[in-house]
Amino acid sequence: MKTVEIPFGFFACLLVNVHAANDPDVSVLAKIAEEALTNTSINACDETNTNNSFIYCYGRLLAAVNVHNLFQDSKSFVDMPLKFDPEVIQEEFNRRFGEYELQAINRSALQAFVDENFESAGNELEDCQLEGWNEHPPKLMKIQDSMLRDWALKLNAIWKLLCRKMKPNQNPKRTSLIHIPEEFIVPGGRFREFYYWDAYWIVKGLAASGLHSTIKKMITNFVTVVDRYGFIPNGGRIYYLGRSQPPLLIPMVYEYYELTRDLAFVNKILPTLIREYEFWQNNRVINVSDDKGNTFSVFHYHSKCNVPRPESFLADIIHASRLPAHERPKFYMNIASGAESGWDFSSRWLKDGHKIETIETTDIIPIDLNAFICWNLDILQYLLRNTGNPLKSKTLRDKREILRQAMFHVFYNDTEGAWFDYNLRTKSHNFNFYPSIVVPLFGECYQPLNLARPQQIVNYLNKMGVYNYPGGVPTSLIKDTKQQWDFPNGWSPTNHMIIEGMRKSSNPVVQEQAYRLAKKWVLGNFKVFQETGHMWEKYDVNGTAPQPGSGGEYLVQDGFGWSNGVILDLLTTYHERMRIEPGDLMPNNNASATNNNGSTTGSASERMHSKSITPLIPIIISILYTYLLTR
């Protein structure tokens, strides 16, 4: 691949502010920010679980920095360590700016204050050495195709670049980081800390690389967090303490146990795993009744935070400015709940399918969350049985069966032959396509002897045309939402869950469909890596060839933890069969892809011409963006 050095200044003009020119002025934003500083606010963190929440989770300083838009990304500020104790900084802020209303604070003076009192974002972390890292892991060396094997070894080396640990002698009062004892793998880009559900696919990749001790350390970190807070937050910062993410700690432990048979470790942490399950049972359950009067207990995402998210403060108050004041607290709650889902954000959560201001996450009962919980129960009963606790194992096995039956009654539609989200407001299913409908197969939360069930799901996916895209399965078929969990983006975890859900089936036809999608996803990622030298957080699966994805509240990020993990897992799963055949790396010259409306997206040659320069733009912008944030 030929490398061309491009002067930084040449593309500097491409770096645009993420906020539009018609956004509200400072006075409007200041008024909305002041509303969130009331006594009825439920903040992301507070004095009950932190000792610096008034800096990072709420307060006039946080509001002022965002109202005056000191940073392109709100997350930059709340990731900055303190140079002094938080009480000292708060007192100095009050002395300098306490007499001014938010909009009247001088922006230059505020910037100078931040520069004097805060260090660079991410400065409390340092790189680490991966114990047992091997340049040629045995599993990867079994990959038969030489090009794919060489690529896998390059991805294996990226783990060393993503390994982080906390610097010694850190003062926890002076950082927003949640302190954990062991090293961990970060996703990459702006994501400088651990993230909950990302870690599952990172673990899958670490397993392929033979890094079992790193997996154990990451699990130990999560166990420490559950022991401290009673649950696992969205990510490793205190401003994430108001919400979780899809519950995948227990599946991570299952992966580790199957690799190592380390029963002593599993037995030691089992009480904590049960406690993590109980968080969801005690805080995220809602009852749903059918038209026959039967009531079912199911799970939904429901953060109680009713204020702007600290890491996305400016974006939240800009959206809130388009709503009446009395609707804003519920909007913030639904935004936080959408972030808890991991799908931040998607038409899946939007009342009108397009505008973020119509978000109604808490009114939606998601099929994938319930399938995750069902999977958790199956793993827990298995681990309990293996550690000599058959009675507790049976209790959880019975709970799983009750939930499996509830999932059939609440989510399954006989006509379509698939599971769908259930909307409490409309009392109906959302029949739009989302990959989440396959998670019951992934978590094996259906009757495994029913060979027709997986085939019905495959038939539905075929009917929706989601296999027709050259780069993989998109996250929805809803267009023009500008949300990252919608068309045309495809994500590693969703494609992996579709593949694994079908592969685990006993139906050989469905298993073959899994392989075809796996090869498509692998080759798409490979092409982008060949072009850019990077793995990306998400991919545009449309057009003649995939490219880095776009949309959402921030620029596309490289790295990237779960993308690397999925590829390594698929390459080792299909290590004998998957090969690059002649013509595989050529652009897709097939006829036009059909969209969900039955119309076409244009011929291959037209799409290639229109996108010839497009793949470079998000890459260049992302690099410039990261560069400026770290200056």
Please provide the spans of the model-predicted regions.
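Inter-helical turn/loop segments and adjacent helix faces that build the functional surface
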Residues: 256-268, 380-395, 504-509
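C-terminal GPI-anchoring signal of eukaryotic secretory precursors
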Residues: 584-617
